[in-house]
Amino acid sequence: MALHPPDEPGPYPAEVRHRIRRDMLPDYVFVARALNQCGTGVVSIQHEYGIWGGRDGDYVLDFVRELRRPTVVTLHTVLRTPTPSQRHVLVSLIEAADASVVMSRAAASLLTRAYGVDPRRLDVVPHGVPDLPLVSPDSVKPRLGLSTDPVILSFGLLGPGKGYETVIEAMPQVVEAVPNARYVVLGATHPELLRHEGEKYRRSLEECAVALGVADRVLFVDRFVGRRELGTWLEAADVFVTPYPNLDQIVSGTLSYAMGAGKAIVSTPYAYASELLADGRGRLVEPGSPSALATAFIELLHDRNVRETLGGRAYEYSRSMIWPQVGARYRQIFARVAGQVAAPTALSRRLTSVHG
């Protein structure tokens, strides 16, 4: 089943059997009834703000209430200060589902504390990551046409609010200490941003690099990359950075992937990063501070042993985040809600404590 936003082209691949037009409420009811009739075992719903139609995505409630099949909802975002409408949608969705999955202990705690959700309704399952080998970055760089110059990497859909400017502003100080260091910004511009203002934001970053005299040390890879190539870029990175200014961010797929690749990570202390990078698994720096970022980068780029120590800790921690482990946990939850096994009385820390 796919949610179809307005103005998006088709068609979908063969595995998509049903399509819901995002802003057409009758589609939600029709597809729910179709799933009831075709004997679907379990319906797995991914909830993210902005995906579902209606006010704050409340059409998803009509969909879930029409379902007569066991339902598991995965919550990708839990807002620390929701509006009354956003809170109503999320709490109602959790109450309507047979099980709800969050990807961090911080998210589970927030739902319990601020939303009044019964913790027994929540399962904590890590954000999944590919099972990448732990390799030397310099052994991988030639596959991307790179020299062995040190690489600081960010990836994801490009858009404001991710702190890329702060990293670029840190680069003059970094290059003074490590002249051959390079910052790579990997990823296409977010399609919604592209639709509304084109490449204005990307150009502003490029202009910032030029103004600071580091244009030759900042590389923009302006395209979407598939999973295999993304894995290669992660393996090639010496340092990974998530400089996000929003300290309430409850999950980050990019940070999860960097953990899975065993990277030395520098990050602002948003909720998810604080959880994953605790106990010496990374470096946390204050948000919006080019100087703090530069200091962390220089330390790591000057000391291979420190990089490898941080990366090794991140890699070990991420082993329960790899997709086979995450898939096994979801199968357990699906079986439980389908009535095939009894609900567990206790869940092991390894499988329920978030690592991604």
Where are these regions (language model features)?
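Conserved acidic donor-binding segment of nucleotide-sugar-dependent glycosyltransferases
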Residues: 279, 283-290, 299-305
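Conserved donor-binding/catalytic core segment of Leloir-type glycosyltransferases
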Residues: 146-162, 168-171, 184-186
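Acidic donor-binding loop of glycosyltransferase active sites
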Residues: 98, 217-223, 232-249, 263
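A short helix/loop element that forms part of the nucleotide-sugar donor recognition site in Leloir-type
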Residues: 134-146, 151, 347
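A short, well-ordered alpha-helix in the C-terminal region of glycosyltransferases
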Residues: 292, 299, 306-320, 332
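Carbohydrate-associated surface elements
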Residues: 106, 128, 189
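Short hydrophobic beta-strand element within catalytic cores of glycosyltransferases
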Residues: 259-260, 264-267
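Nucleotide-activated donor-binding/catalytic signature segment of Leloir-type glycosyltransferases, i.e.
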Residues: 196-224, 228
